Amino acid sequence: MMKKIDVKIVDPRVGQQFPLPTYATPGSAGLDLRACLDQAIELKAGETTLIPTGLAIHIADTGLAAVILPRSGLGHKHGVVLGNLVGLIDSDYQGQLMVSVWNRGQQTFTVEPGERIAQMVFVPVVQAEFNLVEDFVGSERGEGGFGHSGRS
């Protein structure tokens, strides 16, 4: 079942000069978010900046959230990732979607107006209710942590 999410265009260029977010293929999990800029931005190596998307969303459903993720090609080819690594959009947030972009590469990277800079995925949310206990029921793994299963 498809969920409908309210999207507010906060910059009139979105839907005109810059396309609305769409799923690239029927199997795509993420929608591409674009840089809603007046002019190109040069992001020097090591720099971080906030880039507007021109969109605001209100998910409203407390059973959903959105995550903003890097685009794989920008990270792999250019070293450009999200400054906060992953952005979390709560269901009650209603402001403009901003993308923190970090150039962890060695070269200056130019972000062009309308360029796809990140992707957004909607995910289910479960809020935990904590129960204080003295001990846990034993499991096969137990307290095995980092590297507990080996490498091969």
Curated annotation (Swiss-Prot):
Group of enzyme by EC: hydrolase
Cited CDD domains: trimeric_dUTPase
Cofactor(s) of this protein: Mg(2+)
Function text: This enzyme is involved in nucleotide metabolism: it produces dUMP, the immediate precursor of thymidine nucleotides and it decreases the intracellular concentration of dUTP so that uracil cannot be incorporated into DNA.
PANTHER family: DEOXYURIDINE 5'-TRIPHOSPHATE NUCLEOTIDOHYDROLASE
Protein family (similarity comment): Belongs to the dUTPase family.
Name the UniProt record assigns to this protein: Deoxyuridine 5'-triphosphate nucleotidohydrolase
